[in-house]
């Protein structure tokens, strides 16, 4: 059951190489001190069920959903883009079981503000287990964390916990570029 207005869901399976990107970003986000109205979830492979039941089970209405996943948008491995449900052609966004996630997102978009943050994968294993992200996708995690924080209106510096477990607070790194064109690489 959900108790927050903003939900950040990392989708994917860490057993299949770069498909573990969403859960890896969620792991880093959980190290941060986020506002009480934000819920960070490792949705793993349960994304279809999660999306269908999101509204029905929420005690507090969910107003914003940020989905973090791999997305093959023709970029270079490790490139990151922001998409809206209307940017997805029907059938373009499928989970590991080939379930179409575009349709439930289309249904939810009029009730919830939905953003998909996708990282171009380099390698996704399909028949054998392959633990770990490729170097290019691993390097996209800090930028993605900053993009997520920007998307939910949280300043990065205010989120670092007192133990300093968040490893990449480099002052020279951009906080996530903004864009004017949907689906444009950021």
Locate the predicted segments by residue.
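Glycine-rich loops and low-complexity Gly/Arg-rich segments
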Residues: 32-35, 64-68, 89-93, 106-108, ...
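Nucleotide and nucleotide-moiety/phosphate-recognizing core
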Residues: 3-8, 14-18, 23-85
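Ubiquitous "structural anchor" signal
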Residues: 18-20, 28-30, 172, 176, ...
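A short glycine/serine-rich beta->alpha loop
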Residues: 11-15, 90-91, 130-131
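Phosphate-binding/catalytic loops
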Residues: 101-166, 171, 176, 183-186
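Helix-loop-strand module that forms the ligand-binding subsite of alpha/beta enzymes
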Residues: 70-114
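Conserved active-site and cofactor/substrate-binding residues in soluble primary-metabolism enzymes
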Residues: 20, 24, 45, 96-99, ...
